[in-house]
């Protein structure tokens, strides 16, 4: 995987009540990632960007909701979410990340 692709795979952290609870309970971090990203690419990107060791990666596709407006029915975009489990003793501090 080339260096340019590493910077494009991770789109940002997912901030929600569920992701905060998972992070505290089982040393996981949740990221929004590119739709065509694989588990291997996500693992390599997290290890390279945050200098941490990744134990495992789980991914899921989030389907966009159907929303109604006064002009008709629209749909939000589908996206991919990755649950990254860090090895024991590792953590990611987003305030200090490079």
From Swiss-Prot:
One of its GO terms (cellular component) is ribosome. It holds the Pfam family Ribosomal_L23. Keywords: Ribonucleoprotein, Ribosomal protein, RNA-binding, rRNA-binding. One of its GO terms (biological process) is translation. Signal peptide: none annotated. GO terms for molecular function: rRNA binding; structural constituent of ribosome. NCBIfam families: PRK05738.1-3, PRK05738.2-4. One of the early assembly proteins it binds 23S rRNA. One of the proteins that surrounds the polypeptide exit tunnel on the outside of the ribosome. Forms the main docking site for trigger factor binding to the ribosome. PANTHER family: 60S RIBOSOMAL PROTEIN L23A. Belongs to the universal ribosomal protein uL23 family. Part of the 50S ribosomal subunit. Contacts protein L29, and trigger factor when it is bound to the ribosome. This is Large ribosomal subunit protein uL23. It comes from Cellvibrio japonicus (strain Ueda107). The gene is rplW.
């Amino acid at each position: 995987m080339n260096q340019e692709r590493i910077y494009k795979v991770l789109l940002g952290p997912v901030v929600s009540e569920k992701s905060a609870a998972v992070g505290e309970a089982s040393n996981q971090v949740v990221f929004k990632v590119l739709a065509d990203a694989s588990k291997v690419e996500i693992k390599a990107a997290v290890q390279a960007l945050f200098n941490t060791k990744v134990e495992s990666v789980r991914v899921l596709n989030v389907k966009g909701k159907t929303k109604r407006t006064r002009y008709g029915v629209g749909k939000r975009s589908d996206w991919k979410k990755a649950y990254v489990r860090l090895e024991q003793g590792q953590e990611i501090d987003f305030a200090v990340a490079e």
